[in-house]
């Protein structure tokens, strides 16, 4: 009985209110911790205290590695840090990491599902040196074309914006690279809904441009970039526009052989003049070929894309409004290209006619026995 009464009293002790007396301190609880001590230092586990802070190159490399993180905010913040580091570097100073090292990590972000990441990626692209981008155009184009044909509409628009930046930086390299001309034009036809000969047989092949406001802005961007792409590929060169007007005033057509072909015998301007032969690469089809000259690009364009793009621009013009104004830029480039191509063809006809009338040919210049 004594032990049970003691246990019962201890249990009731927790539910009884203690009586405080004047001048007597309150009792301390059982879990009381004494914090009256003083310490000159606080030691934390797993803490590294170093006198030297990480260098800017180390931080740059660290943020490059974070671009493959699964967190959208972390990828966006890393892109912002890289953009700030590149933009704030001294003039004519090299990048903390070469473009060839950074670019393979940046390219998959063109297809990123987060809009903020893609927007920050475009800002980073614009901060990179333009001279370094020209050498990496063949690596950029496959990701851009994949974005232009993506199922998500916002990713398609972002890819078109990246293509606009790339044309502004290296337009000649874009249209003359392997697959950069035909494959990119096919992507434009897919985005705009302008079909080629295979799908033109369907009656409902006409794309609708009657969207106003914010819904029509993506289509306007695509038409604007299409005009830029056509201007880079088949736009009439400013320094060669006068050659067409010189046909009747003793121009190149009036020169004798070999003066009329002097440019063929000079040192090439390009770094790899025989790359179009593809001597040591894998066999390529017509879409994967390199079209480095204006004549080659215009020949392929007139045979495969001219009618489809003319039909699409005419439909956009008939819709009127913002779409009609946006299509006027591409229509202007197309008309100038057709006029320039007609002048080139007339010049070739006049040149061949003059050679025939003079009776001068390559066989006439060969030594006779």
Swiss-Prot record:
Keywords: Nucleus, Ribosome biogenesis, rRNA processing. It is found in: Nucleus. Gene3D superfamilies: Leucine-rich Repeat Variant. Residues 1-33, 349-369 are annotated as: Disordered. One of its GO terms (biological process) is rRNA processing. Residues 1-10 have a biased composition (Basic residues). GO terms for cellular component: nucleus; rixosome complex. It comes from the Eukaryota. Its main location: nucleus. InterPro entries: ARM-like, ARM-type_fold, Ipi1_N. It holds the Pfam family Ipi1_N. Component of the RIX1 complex required for processing of ITS2 sequences from 35S pre-rRNA. PANTHER family: REGULATOR OF MICROTUBULE DYNAMICS PROTEIN (PTHR16056), TESTIS-EXPRESSED PROTEIN 10 (PTHR16056:SF2). Component of the RIX1 complex, composed of ipi1, rix1/ipi2 and ipi3 in a 1:2:2 stoichiometry. The complex interacts (via rix1) with mdn1 (via its hexameric AAA ATPase ring) and the pre-60S ribosome particles. Belongs to the IPI1/TEX10 family. This is Pre-rRNA-processing protein ipi1. It comes from Aspergillus oryzae (strain ATCC 42149 / RIB 40) (Yellow koji mold).
